[in-house]
Design a protein with these regions (language model features):
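Short acidic-glycine-tyrosine-enriched beta hairpin
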Residues: 69-84
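Short aromatic/basic micro-patch
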Residues: 49, 81, 106
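A short, acidic/glycine-rich surface segment
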Residues: 39-44, 88-92, 114-115
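Generic protein-terminus/edge-of-domain signal
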Residues: 1-66, 70-73
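A hydrophobic/aromatic-rich effector-binding and dimerization subdomain
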Residues: 2-3, 91-158
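Short beta-strand His + acidic residue motifs that chelate non-heme Fe in jelly-roll/DSBH
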Residues: 64-66, 82, 88-97
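Short, charged/polar surface micro-motifs in flexible loops or helix N-caps
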Residues: 60-63, 85-87, 108-112
Length: 161
């Protein structure tokens, strides 16, 4: 019988799933991860609730991801935004995992509350994110996103490819 129980996923626990050489961050409040397939990622095939804010950008590859029991096909140039308490599960990982490449930004609610963010705007757009947390970025935004992620990596000391 398949184990379908959920568990809470914190940033500290999330970091355990990826090699230290592929991640950087600020204690357990902020983490930037260059996600390549690793056997430890199979743990994400079990439902979990992330207790912070997570943004996952698909550089290359296809996986299926369930967010709040809705299944999404994640492909190149997709941006996934998960809000606190979202139920997450990787539902399908392709056999050829060499081509999978994602960049993940995860932050605690406490860290996010310290950022200068217009929460009125976030809340109004947050309703849309609850309905559809997966966005396919237009081609002109893809290059801008790559530059932004490179800048974040440089400032944090990470080495993203």
């Amino acid at each position: 019988m398949e184990n379908t129980s959920t568990y809470n996923l914190s940033i500290s626990r999330l970091k355990e799933y990826f090699p230290a050489s592929h991640r950087t961050g600020i204690s357990d409040d902020f983490c930037l991860i260059d996600v390549r397939f690793d056997g430890r990622m199979h743990k994400l095939e079990h439902p979990c609730r992330f207790d912070g804010i997570m943004m996952l950008y698909c550089v290359k590859g296809n996986v299926k991801l369930s967010i709040n029991l809705n299944e999404y096909e994640i492909a190149d140039n997709s941006l996934i935004v998960c809000l606190p308490g979202n139920l997450l599960k990787v539902t399908e990982i392709p056999e050829d995992t060499d081509g999978l490449h994602y960049v993940m930004i995860a932050m605690s609610q406490n860290f996010a509350s310290g950022l200068r963010i217009d929460f009125k705007k976030v809340l109004s757009e947050g309703v849309a994110l609850l309905k559809d947390p997966v966005i396919t970025l237009p081609e002109n935004v893809k290059e801008l996103t790559a530059h932004y992620l490179s800048l974040m990596a440089e400032l944090s000391g990470a080495e993203l490819e």
